[in-house]
Amino acid sequence: MSKSPKKSKSLTRAGNRPATISAQQTIPYVRMLPDGICQLPGGVYTKTLEYEDINYSVASAEDQTAIFGGWSSWLNYFDSSLPFQLSFVNRRSRSGSRYKVNISEADDRFNSVRTEYTGMLKNQIAKSNNGIERAKYVTFCIPAENVAARPRLERVEADVIGNFKRLGVQSQPLDGRERLALLHGQLHPGSREPFRFKWADIAHTGMGTKDFIVPDSFDFRQSRSFRVGQTWGAASYLQIMASELSDKLLLEILELDAELTVTMHIQTVDQVKAIKTVKGKISDIDKMKVEEQRKATRSGYDPDILPPDLVTFSKDAAGLLADLQSRNERMFLLTFLIVNTAPTRERLENDIFTVNGIAQKYNCAVKRLDWQQEQGYMSSLALGYNGIEIQRGMTTSSTAIFIPFMTRELRMDGPSLYYGMNALSHNVIMADRKKLKSANGLYLGSTGSGKSFAAKRELLNVFLAIPQDRIIVVDPMGEYAPLVERLGGQVIEIAPDSPNHISPMDVQMDMGGGDSPLSLKADFLLSLCELVVGGRDGLQPIEKTVIDRCVRQVYRELALGLDKAKTPLLQDLYEELLRQPEPEAKRIATALELYCTGSLNLFNHPTNVNLNSRVVCFVLKGMGENLRKIAMHITNDFVTSAVGTNFKNGVATWCYFDEFHILLRDPLTASYFVTVWKMLRKQGCVPSALTQNVKDLLASREIENILDNTDFMILLSQAQSDRAILAKQIGISEHQLSYITQSNSGEGLLFYGSVTIPFVDRFPRGEIYDLLTTKPEDAANGKQAE
């Protein structure tokens, strides 16, 4: 029958009892309290929790077994006095989506880049889950005479939250308004009507809570479908015929691009009663066996040959009794409902056909609730009400196979950055590395896998979304220059024929912190001289003393704060060494001569580049191995100084080190990166290392220290030998390895703390794509387009 909140009908029922039917009366609850307790007819009180997802689909076989065991224990908590309901609600995203683009508008020379990146983010957000928002709830029920049920409800709520926590699942209770908002969404499928409600509105308007959630109308006149407002719907139940179920059945239904609600009403059977019932069934089967044997004897057949079905029933019953008595199994009565909704009847039937196809694949069937559409729809609401009496007896293990977990989502608020789309849930991935215990990161992938693209995308996202943070890039191959220049940054090419100069003698006297700037500079110059002089044993004590004396002398005027003081050059240190009487000073000066007055004097010039630019990129290509070591050492000194200065100003520094395996070859540089990974992160440094050569990376003696202090990692497609190494070193499961095996560019695994997510990033072509890509064919196409 059709029901409208505006028009109510008086119908005559059996016994001439008039019944006023309205849409409000259709919703099966008596009252909703502000604290989230809901009273149902018959003196039942309920509460609802929302819970998050955890990684199951990409977990190892051992972890999946552990999750299954934990979920079984979670189910066993509920006794026969605690019926409960699991609700899985898939709805089309509303305009007030939980996803936000966190890039502020501005009017500057980066408008085109900002507009394009923001447009990309909005498009990815719109595509998240194909516009489907998925949520999971559990509602538990307690029979009681009045709201004195509250203490027990609160105790059960605390237990359920604690049991979820042991599974690694975050959960939170819904208050009254949140439960009403959930019901409003379920009662307005396909609608963009916002939920407007305040508890004060009840006193002001005289309306009840149902008036704020009720749709325009219900129409249950048809036997196999219904209408709510302008939306079509159908309620069905899952007929379980399989002897063994798959953990993929529920997950595949929930992954559909359709609006639906899957509901599991579960009632625990008292253990004594369950065992007694099974024993009774076994007795019945034994009687049937005796009868069959008598028939066989009378007919002259072998009495040991019994009908196959009877043998199967006997074994199943005996196994069930053993499970209940000795294997921590309980007996549950399960009502499994599926409610589909769609804007048209044709779309509704197509969606139901798809769901039924999934069910049949696992030897189950989706059956329509003929002439029970109203009861089925109301039983799908997250209230704890079940008006459908179709129940299936299930053990703990068979119930637990409907595992409600698929993949952990990573959707953080605040200054979070975009890292692609979750390959399993198709949700956008937004994460804030600064919230990790260690923000240090690694990008690992074979040539052409998209690791440089991913790092540059993050760099650009930092630039646009966190305007106060600084960015430093150490680029051995010169791949970042176009992006840095477009962002108004400073590209510093360090090479013998480069016009760019950085003086290793520069010092900031106002760095702050506990260490003296001159002491730090003296320590740096000692290590620089050690690198220049070379030798297996390094600098001798006398040589170190001489260098320290000369350093203090050349910085004397700066230390005294004299107005005429100038920052010394490397040649000033060289000349000061020549003035010293010790023969060791002559040896050091001779070693420095090549870099002061010789052909490699590129570091013997005043700094002529803007080291205070928000984005600084050091390009280290075009130099020999020895010069590269010195250039790297000087660059490292700048990074340390910049991180310290930025930290003093309350600013984070994002550092990117490409071709990391090359940088680790030099012991001094490798030792420096351990310091970065261990110490500089405490000063707001967010370092990222990139490499395609996993073997060389893991061959470094320092890699253990770096890996132990890395909580963020992006793995893209890997060569076969590298996959084996990574699986052993990092502990990647076989299933997880499939995401980095011959995968396309921009596909892989993201590790964020304890969270592992397979991701896909299909970045649209445009100005940003051209700035980020390093593929030769893309560069060629870009030039042709110009």
Language-model segment annotations:
Residues S2-T407:
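Extended, folded cores of ATP/NTP-driven motor/assembly subunits in large transport
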Residues Y443:
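Hydrophobic anchor at the beta1->P-loop junction of P-loop NTPases
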Residues S446:
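P-loop (Walker A) phosphate-binding loop of NTP-binding proteins
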Residues S449-S503:
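Walker A/P-loop NTP-binding active-site region of P-loop NTPases
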Residues M477, A689-V694, S717-Q720:
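A short beta-strand-to-loop transition that corresponds to the Sensor-1 phosphate-sensing loop
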Residues G488-E493, E702-L715:
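A short helix-turn-beta junction within AAA+ P-loop NTPase domains corresponding to the substrate/partner-engaging
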Residues I730-A785:
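Conserved P-loop NTPase
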